[in-house]
Each structure stands twice: as structure tokens, then as C-alpha cells.
Amino acid sequence: MASITNPAYKALIVDNAGTKYGFEKTQTSLDISQPEKEIAQKVQFMVPNITVSGKKLKDIISVKNRLYVYYDIGSGWKEKFRGYVWTKNTNESDDRTFRIVGYDRAIYLQNSKDSFYFAKGKKTKTILNTIANKWGFKIVFNYSQITHPKTVLRSQAISDSIIEILEEVKKKTGKKYVVYFEKDVLYINTVGTNTTIYSVKKRENALKISTEETMEGMVTKVVIRGSANDNGKTPVVATVKGNTSTYGTLQDEISKDKDTSVANAKKEANEILKEKGKPFKTRSVTAIDNPVIKKGDKVNIQTDDLSGSFIVLSINHDAYQNIMDLEVE
């Protein structure tokens, strides 16, 4: 029987005619991943190339077919993934199986470019809803918002525009966010706000822990520049230093427009130093799979090397092997 430590998974593909093809315990692999640097969730698995009504399955299933993944932990089937077949790989030398790669709706935002202009004074949620309405998706917004200056988003991926807006909020508030699609709705949440906090513990479900510490991406000094003068030069109006004596100078620059005070610009600079002013530690965790855990969740880890609460940066569920790989901070 399915349980939280022995979950069951099944995939479902709906072809162009509306016929449903279910795969439970028949696929030879099934991975569901949420990478750190992308908002699109990815699914990949091998499909048995069985014969259905005289046709091979590889000739029935095509790209853009609807793709769903469900899990059961003992309380019935729940949806884990909703998206599309994006890639189909077949191999003439081995016709027994073929490979499916699917993505949720965010893949369209990552592969489509657009331009937007927003006048000064627009709130974060207003900007994001404008983008969402134009592209036909809904947003559930559970994150902080600010009043933005004039914003020009020119010829870039829709997902990059969304992230650019949210990065401005993070710089000014210091709060981290997570973005993901669930049932075709885009969720924007503050990280670590999940109501159920699952644990990874030694001798229970933890399998392997490793830690990486790096200075890559650090900032120890922030230069604040004002608006350009008639010669195109941008004057330095302030400099905020972090721990340059220990780590050396790793400099970032931010711009202060005429509507932003130096005090507020310094506040933004201090938020950058708070987030990036010391070496980054990333912990990689391999544990028995828990399909409920997703990117942005808070998890409790208790092992010899780690103890406390951590935020999930990325996660891969290997349903076939019943393990999950997480990167946490």
C-alpha cells in the first residue's frame, strides 16, 4: 500500500483525439524536477511502446499532448504535474520503449519573448497581472509588493520579465520568493511558507548529505550611481561596503533614479550585502522520496552534519528508484 515513505506514481497522456493513456508501474523511469534557475517543472520517463488498436504507441502520442503525473501517499491520487509532451525520442534500433520529456505551462513563458512598458507608480501585483492577462494565465500572489519606478521590459522572455520584477521586490524587502505552476496557475509565494514541514532524518529517510561552500556570486561592495548627466556619465552618489577585509572587493552597482532617495538606495545596497556578502553554502541531500515536497518549501533536516530548517532550492523526484535529490540552503 502507498505511504509517505513508499509513494506510488502514475503518468497520464491525453492524445489529440482525447483518448487517455495511463502508465502506472509500466514505465521504466520517471523523474519530476524543479531546477533552481528555471520556473518550468520538467518530467521525463520511458514509455513502453505497446500496440494499441493496431498502432504502436510511439505513433499515437505526439508533442503538445497533455501530460499529467499523479502521486498517492495512502490517501488517494493527487496531481503532481500538469503540462505538455514537449519532446518525444524514439530509437529504431530499440523499438521496445521511447522517451517522453514534458514541461508545465511555464515552458511557454521561457520560450516566448515580449515587451512591456509600465509607468512610474505601478504596484508589483498590477504589473504581473498585466503580463498574465496578456498571456492568458492566472496568478496566485502570496508575496510582498512594492511601488515600482518606470519599468521597461524589452524583447525578453516572459519568464525573465517576471523574475526581473520579483528581483526588484527582493532587493528592496530582503524577502525571497519562489515561482511555479500548479494546475496551470502561476503561484508566486514567499519561500518557506508551507504549512506542513517535512523532516529528513538520519537512520529514517536521509541517505546522503554533501556541502559546497563558494565565493561565486558574492558581493562585498555596492556602488550607487545617479542619473546620467549631459555627457552620459553616471556619478557615484554613495558606496556601501561589506566585509572587504576578509573576502576582498567583489563589486556590484545599482542605479538611483531621481525619485529614489540616497537613504533608500543604501537600504537596497545593504539588502544585497545581507544576501550576498558572505560565502554561499549549498547542501545536497539525497533521501527517500516524498512527492509532497517542492521547490521553495521549508524542510527540517537532522543528520550528523546538518541540523535545523532549510529552504529547498531545487528538487528532483526519482519515482522509479523512490529517492529524491534536493539542494537546500
Model-derived segments and spans:
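Short intrinsically disordered coil segments
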Residues: 59-63, 115-121, 201-208, 239-241, ...
